[in-house]
Structure formats: structure tokens, C-alpha cells
Amino acid sequence: VLQDTVLFKDTIENNLKYGNETATFEEVKKAGIMSNSNYFIKNLPDRYNTVLSEGGSNLSQGQRQLLSIGRAILADPKILILDEATSSVDTRTEKNIQDAMRNLMANRTNLIIAHRLSTIQDSDVIVVIDKGEIVEQGNHKQLLEKQGKYYNLYMTQFSGKEI
């Protein structure tokens, strides 16, 4: 799941099935529900048969990200790479995307590249890279206790809110 979602001029159903072309409509709809994209799809005039503009330009960035997550749910990879999946969306949309990502990340190996620490704080292992070098690693709690680079980033992003 990339920061810039690739969608093509076709139906939402077919854009989702790009991750698994043999998926049934029921599987597509389940992926829509699990990815939280069903909440906006059900309000579209043709729902899953709605034709997207090239690149999905008739959807918001957050909606495109949710479809990308739905596509990944249908693909069901053993290893999942999330590259800045929430970087260009507002805070409310980020919450929807993070909820969808929890569904997607369950029971698989995940590699998450993120600047927003809210995206990674539930990870088993967090590797902090600064200027191309690994400077810290551990889980969220361990890294906060070290009060190093991760701690400073966390405090900057969350303005000292309770940890």
C-alpha cells in the first residue's frame, strides 16, 4: 500500500479486484467493509459499479487509500509493505485508514514506512532511521523510555499529550 494510490478508469469493483482478479463480488464487498471503504461506496449512485476517473481523481485521497487497502485485503499477501499510507490525509481520515490497516495487518508480516508515529506505535519492533543510519530499535514503550530520537519525534508530534 503506497502513499500514492494507483487506480484506473474502471469500476470500483474492478479496481479492488486488481489485487485478486478471481475474487467474487461477496469477497470484494467484504474487503470494502474491512477496509472501511464501504462507508463511502454505499453512498455512490452505482456503489461498486461506479466508474472511477483515471487515477481515481473523482475520489478524495483518503478514499483512494481505503480502496488501496481493500485491494491489499483481497490480495492477501504473506508480507505487506505500507509506505507512508497515511501521510497525505487529514487526522479524521487517518483514523479510518488506521482502523482498516489493523484489519489488513493481522496475522502477517508487515513492513511499515512512516513519519506519523501513530501509524507504527503498535508495532512489535520499531526501527528508527536517521540520515540513513539505524539509531534506535525496540517497541513503542521501550523507545519512549530511552528518551532518544523516537521520544523526541513522539513528543513533537503529540505535543506532550499523555503517553
Predicted regions and their residues:
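Conserved H-loop
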Residues: T22, N38-P45
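Alpha-helical elements of the RecA-like P-loop NTPase motor core of helicases
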Residues: D10, K42, Q121, Y151-N152, ...
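Conserved beta-strand edge residues that scaffold enzyme active sites
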Residues: P45-D46, Q157
